[in-house]
């Protein structure tokens, strides 16, 4: 007789294979996750296991047997220059070669989503192969390439980078993205005031007005951590070492930790340090399996051909629910202040970020770049209820954009592997994109690492860091979607008031399960 566990597994698999809204490829993906999650979890200390079971710590549903890194950032420049022995490919000689080679390699780059989350610094990669092509000839090729990416790798966590320099490829990508208004790929423009022309930044702002893309990253801030050109921004907005990536992402539920604290002092001296240690234990256990049992780094041709280096992978030490944690702690202390509203509450939030950063900087991990994890303000998952992503302000009653940026900016100094806040701007900004440029520059002057904006009235909007079409959400449940992240946005709409709120789109990252 089948056990209750076996019956439950069969029921979940049956739900997947009979779903009217999943494509065959999507069904295969979720069936594989069910199989992986039927395996035993890596051995954990008792307290770490309890924290995971109680939801104080979340492993992002990455799976019980991490047999591949969460995020992989290959050295695409090396690949284009030398080709691949494993794939029996010679190096590129022209732009057509380069685009063809990239489209081949993308299908061999693993990630938590089973699709590549990093496409490379595309303008820097492709510009050397342009040769004698005219701008029109470049535009045709890039538009075709852009459409190919969305149709064959339909996942909005797939992320391309451009900038800080100007080039015909840079302009072609911006034109294609604005015209096609695709959910994927995600896009970040890396800004450097010493390199980026003013008219190029204005063009980037016009693109945001048109399609809510790209993110704009503060290049000099990232350069200090990774060195110039030594990193990529992937998935939603994760900053990670190039030729490496992110091995795993585990996150603290700060709201749950605050609920288990007797006072503000108890939070900082007992509960937060305790759960930080448990999170490190989970990170180490997952990385131990990846490095020692999965054999990924021993067998991958990406390692053998020098496209990735196991020592350049870093675990991400995530957190979320800061807003709720601060409000709970203020209530326990009798402080009449709310996060994002009063300075006293904001200071508690900054203190939490500072203590997390100090812990991560001073706590070694078994496997990781520089033997440390990297702090990440995690942007939520689609099933989260009652928590605000990362260090963001609670949704629905945000202040004006300038006050908003000034309030969240101090957090950005601490989160080396990514933090983002989404501004929602009135569509009148389309008549004055220079105002958007000034907002961005002001944000960077205040210390922000990333600038991201949605423009009211656009069908294409950003949910956390990934894109969805609002029109797709309305028809997903009846018809399904070829894009793997539409269901996440639809689930977020069911679990929150995303479609009822003022035009700020909430943030949720990939959740590794299927629910009808």
Label for each model-derived stretch:
Residues 2-311, 332, 338-342, 358-515:
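Conserved catalytic cores of very large enzyme subunits
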Residues 117, 309-325:
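Conserved phosphate/anionic-ligand binding catalytic regions in large, soluble enzymes, centered on
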Residues 272-275, 318, 348, 352:
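Amphipathic alpha-helix face/heptad-repeat signature
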Residues 324-332:
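Well-ordered alpha-helical scaffold segments within catalytic/enzyme domains
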Residues 338, 342-347, 353:
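Active-site loop/helix belt of alpha/beta enzymes
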């Amino acid at each position: 007789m089948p056990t209750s566990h076996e019956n439950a597994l069969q029921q979940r698999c049956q739900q997947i294979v009979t779903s009217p809204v999943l494509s065959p490829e999507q069904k295969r993906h979720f069936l594989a996750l069910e199989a992986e999650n039927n395996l035993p979890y890596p051995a954990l200390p008792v307290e770490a296991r309890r924290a995971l079971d109680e939801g104080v710590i979340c492993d992002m549903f990455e799976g019980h047997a991490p047999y591949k890194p969460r995020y992989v950032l290959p050295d695409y420049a090396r690949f284009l220059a030398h080709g691949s022995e494993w794939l029996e490919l010679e190096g590129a000689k022209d732009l057509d070669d380069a685009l063809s080679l990239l489209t081949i390699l993308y299908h061999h780059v693993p990630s938590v989503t089973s699709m590549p989350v990093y496409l490379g610094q595309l303008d820097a990669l492709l510009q050397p192969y342009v040769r004698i092509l005219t701008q029109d000839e470049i535009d045709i090729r890039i538009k075709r390439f852009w459409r190919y990416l969305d149709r064959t790798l339909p996942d909005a966590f797939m992320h391309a980078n451009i900038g800080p320099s100007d080039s015909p490829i840079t302009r072609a990508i911006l034109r294609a993205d604005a015209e096609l208004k695709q959910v994927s790929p995600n896009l970040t423009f890396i800004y450097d005031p010493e390199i980026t022309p003013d008219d190029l930044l204005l063009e980037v702002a016009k693109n945001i007005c048109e399609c809510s893309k790209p993110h704009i990253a503060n290049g000099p801030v990232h350069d200090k951590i990774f060195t110039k050109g030594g990193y990529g921004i992937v998935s939603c907005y994760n900053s990670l070492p190039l030729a490496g990536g992110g091995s795993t992402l585990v996150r603290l539920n700060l709201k749950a930790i605050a609920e288990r604290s007797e006072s503000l002092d108890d939070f900082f001296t007992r509960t937060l340090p305790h759960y930080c240690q448990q999170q490190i234990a989970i990170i180490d256990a997952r990385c131990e399996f990846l490095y020692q049992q999965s054999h990924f780094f021993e067998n991958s041709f990406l390692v053998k051909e020098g496209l990735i280096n196991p020592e350049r992978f870093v675990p991400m030490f995530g957190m979320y629910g800061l807003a709720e944690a601060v409000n709970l702690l203020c209530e326990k202390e009798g402080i009449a202040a709310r996060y994002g509203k009063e300075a006293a509450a904001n200071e508690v939030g900054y203190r939490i970020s500072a203590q997390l950063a100090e812990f991560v900087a001073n706590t070694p991990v078994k496997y990781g770049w520089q033997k440390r994890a990297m702090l990440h303000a995690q942007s939520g998952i689609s099933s989260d209820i009652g928590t605000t992503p990362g260090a963001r302000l609670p949704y629905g009653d945000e202040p004006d954009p300038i006050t908003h940026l000034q309030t969240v900016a101090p957090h950005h100094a601490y989160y080396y592997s990514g933090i983002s806040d989404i501004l929602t701007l009135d569509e009148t900004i389309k008549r004055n994109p220079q105002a958007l440029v000034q907002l961005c520059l002001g944000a960077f002057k205040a210390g922000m690492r990333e600038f991201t904006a949605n423009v009211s009235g656009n069908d294409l909007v950003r949910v956390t860091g990934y894109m969805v079409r609002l029109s797709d959400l309305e028809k997903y449940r009846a018809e399904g979607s070829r894009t793997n992240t539409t269901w996440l946005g639809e689930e977020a709409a069911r679990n929150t008031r995303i479609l009822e709120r003022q035009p700020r789109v909430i943030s949720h990252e990939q959740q590794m399960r299927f629910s009808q």
